[in-house]
Regions:
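Positively charged n-region of N-terminal signal peptides that target proteins for export
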Residues: 1-5
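Beta-rich carbohydrate-recognition and catalytic domains
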Residues: 18-139, 147-266, 275-339, 353-381
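Bacterial N-terminal signal peptides
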Residues: 7-15
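Short glycine-rich, acidic/polar surface loops and turns
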Residues: 334-336, 344-347
Length: 381
């Protein structure tokens, strides 16, 4: 497969609409930060790998056939099973106009090479006649992230959207096609203190073991990073019931938050599952740029991707953070659709055949992939 390098750890082409953008040469920041996972490059001529199509299924909520992925397909999770990459992507029907006004469902696609996708005709997670209608009717199930335990249990963290409040929810599966919903991630924490908290974007800590990224622990507990306007953390004994980490004032502990003058000046939203390496814990995240107080190298409201290094023994301690994005909008389909200011929204990371495949949403409209050939940094020792 012929690959065209388009982004190092930082930098994009000014010719693609980003004035004053850094060049594609390896930057000093990349050279100084040997913990950064990458570089990632887009395979030439293959993206987007998932686009909308008029597939129909019977919707138990609407009690009729609906074209469940007709409008947009984006924000994908990714993992591997039986030698294939599995991509679980958010799909929107055409029931309304405007961001957040349609119904979202999670679709399934599989690939032997990470590029050519075989898709299921029906979604695998959606608003159903179940005990969770108050959580995901009518907005649906959004923005999945998926990680796997060593014994083959897949855990999905997704946003349950009832059009009143977005909340982080949990589902599990053994085959990635049949999912069991468990409800809100923070439902049992602190006597229900965070039941109605607006929360989303959960990234469970993983590590590379053999040929698979698997869920890891810190001090005997599972760990996830979560959040949109800031990055927080939570721990769990069972991967279903999660307890947000609190600070000395008994408030949510902020690990990072937006920075003036940077690409992440409006939002810092968790990306794919975090990864333990020999350098510590690497968290990839999505940053939104402010037009007034952000980085002038990137358009206002553009979504770019950053990386953060945390201490492997003290996972709430920040050791380093990139000042520039390692991945940013470049292709036309990343700068058109629902977010015309430009969006690469990373959510899925899969280790497959000695490469890393990073799946991302393009302007809330398509799914694309970038590839990293250098996976030595994933080694724990």
């Amino acid at each position: 497969m012929k690959l065209k390098f388009i982004i190092g750890v930082v930098g994009i082409l000014s010719a693609c609409g980003f004035t004053n953008a850094p060049s594609l040469d390896t930057t000093q920041e990349e050279q100084d930060n040997n913990w950064v996972i990458g570089p990632f490059h887009r395979p030439e001529g293959v993206n987007p790998v998932i686009s909308p199509q008029p597939t129909e299924f019977y919707c138990p909520m609407r009690k009729q056939q609906v074209k469940w992925e007709e409008s947009d397909t984006f924000n994908p999770a990714a993992t591997t099973k039986d030698g294939k990459i599995i991509v679980l992507y958010r799909a929107e029907d055409n029931s309304a106009q405007g961001i957040g006004k349609r119904t979202s469902r999670v679709g399934y696609a599989e690939s032997k090479d990470g590029i050519e996708m075989k898709r299921m005709a029906s979604p695998v997670l959606f608003p159903a006649e179940d005990n969770f209608k108050d959580q995901d009717w009518p907005g649906g199930c959004e923005d999945p992230r998926v990680a796997m335990t060593e014994d083959g249990l897949y855990v999905m963290l997704y946003t349950a959207w009832n059009r009143k409040k977005a909340r982080l929810a949990v589902a599990t599966s053994r085959d990635l096609k049949n999912w069991k919903k468990h409800g809100l991630a923070f439902d049992k924490a602190y006597n229900g203190r965070f039941n109605n908290l607006f929360c989303k974007s959960g990234s469970i800590l993983t590590k590379l073991k053999g040929n698979q990224l698997v869920i890891d622990k810190v001090d005997g507990k599972y760990l996830m990073y979560w959040g949109e306007y800031a990055v927080y953390a939570a721990t769990s004994d069972n991967l279903i019931d999660w307890y947000p980490v609190l600070d000395e004032k008994n408030e949510l502990m902020k690990i990072i938050q937006p920075r003036k003058g940077h690409f992440d000046s409006l939002l810092t939203e968790c990306g794919p599952p975090a990864v333990r390496t020999k350098h510590g814990i690497v968290l990839m995240y999505n940053g939104k740029n402010s037009g007034k107080t952000g980085d002038a190298d990137y358009p206002a409201n553009a979504y770019c991707a950053g990386q953060l290094l945390l201490d492997g023994d003290d996972p709430y301690k920040v050791l380093d953070r990139l000042d520039k994005p390692f991945f940013a909008p470049e292709a036309p389909f990343e700068k058109s659709g629902q977010y015309k200011d430009g969006t690469v929204f990373i959510e899925g990371l899969a280790y497959h055949k000695r490469k890393l495949y990073l799946y991302y949403g393009c302007a809330d409209s398509r799914v694309a992939v970038a590839v990293c050939d250098d996976v030595k940094k994933l080694k724990i020792k």
